[in-house]
Amino acid sequence: MVLAVIPARGGSKGIPRKNVRLMNGKPLIYYAIHNAKNCPSIDDVVVSSDDEEILKIASSYGVETMTRDSELAKDAVTLDPVIYDAVCTMEKKKGIQYDVVITLQVTSPLLSSDTLDKALESFLASSDDTYISVVNKPHLSWTKKDGCYVPNYEKRLNRQQLPPNYLETGAFLITRRECMEVNSRIGKKVSVYEMPEREAVDIDAASDWVLCEYELKKKRIILRADGYKELGMGHIYHCLTLAYNLTGQEILFVTKEQHEPGLKKLQEANMPVHTIKSDEEFMEFVQEWKPDVVVNDCLNTEADYIKELKKYVKRVVTIEDLGEGADYADVVINALYEDHTRGDNYYWGSNYVCLRDEFFCATPSVFHEQVQNIVVIFGGTDPSNFTKRIYEMAKRIHKDYPEIKFHFALGVGYDQKANQIETDEIAGVYVEQNLKHISDLFGKADLAFTSQGRTVYELATIGVPAVVMAQNEREMKHTFAQMNNGFLNLGLGINVADETIETTFRWLVDTPQIRKEMQSLMMRHDLKSGIKRVIGLILEDEE
């Protein structure tokens, strides 16, 4: 038989009413009671307290309570006699003798029932007398001996190379009944049980309280996105931006293992990622991981897909979703489209643009009468290979515009070698792939060639007049990249003749007043507030 004893004195001075004060909407003592009741190996749970309010709240959660003698509630009294008294009282009441006794501290609300259950299982399978909960904190430390400071180590090493240094967390202590005495709960054969660092916080000060409450409010969020040549890398980059702005939440990317470009980019970004092979496998994983939110950045969804997902997760957010499934999502964020005929769960247009961090501190482009630098950027994979067409044009017209430099920013999924795109300084052509800080390149550009994806918002933020060609029919539905916002849109790129592209280029280079007006139209937009709105919608902080 296993007994869990939860000691909870009423006279907390550092944080008044600490044990019953609401922590993330529940009395602090709830978490210890919840863990004990959800541990299958624990037979009985008792709360020992000198405080009537604590006993009443504990009783409402369906556990045994006992009024602690006033002599055992004094400041100088240690836990040993308190726990011993509780065990003896329960044994007398139940007419039994317990085999194992667990002390559970109220001040460790981050301890999970899973960790407690595993610790107890390990203890029951061992020959140890006592388990003490610890966290491994290897650090270089010093002590004082004979009036001198001396190191607690033999050799200075990096923290990862130091030997284990186990600190007691106070979360729980498991011991065999025969090892218990009035003034001791620790037997001769002692072992430690290492618990996750996140769960090891012990509330002793107000700052500990704030940290625990923050951790308990943390949400588990899945970002579901793929990246490959035909689709492009925009969904991966967009979800990375979301992840960087969801600091403090528990984030996990989920992507299909067969789409290597997207997977590679996530790994390069050092993001936690789980791979799947199919939507069916994804649903199975969602049931296992139990997220609070799923953000689905995979274009159009089917109704059955979202309905199935909603069975396992409270909040489903879809991005750029024009499919039937969007009607069943909690939130649909379509920054690239506008269609206000659909439901109240849709959020449309540039108010919901998510700019990458680098664009919040980027310097706007300085306008020049004479074009000096042109940036060419067609996304992560450029499936229509517009890059090649502009590259050939740049070389062809160099004799007419020798002062102009073309800067090609190639995506990680673009095959530079196969397309023979390389730097040629004599022709004024400069090529870079997978740039880490694209805003620097935009900042010195006088003109840009781009497709009709999210890059148009980044160009608008910097104020770079741009010629736009859509990669596909879907991109043509994106509403922002039009002349009223500073873009010269040529439509579906595969239908645009090379002659038209060149004529457009020459006209813009030779008419600075048009470029200046385009820049002015771009700069009137405030695109930096969108990410805050989107994060609010994901976390359900804004509707």
Where would I find each of the regions flagged by the language model?
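A nucleotide-sugar donor-handling region in carbohydrate enzymes
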Residues: 186-204, 208-211, 328-385, 416
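C-terminal alpha-helical cap of glycosyltransferases
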Residues: 205, 527-543
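Acidic donor-binding loop of glycosyltransferase active sites
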Residues: 443-454, 464
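A short, well-ordered alpha-helix in the C-terminal region of glycosyltransferases
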Residues: 507, 513-528
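Conserved core of the sugar-phosphate nucleotidyltransferase
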Residues: 81, 85-86, 108-196
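Short phosphate-binding loop-to-helix
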Residues: 52-102, 110-118, 277-289, 300-301, ...
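Active-site and donor-binding regions of nucleotide-sugar-utilizing enzymes
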Residues: 83, 228-230, 238, 244-245, ...
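Donor-nucleotide binding loops and adjacent catalytic segments primarily
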Residues: 259, 372-445
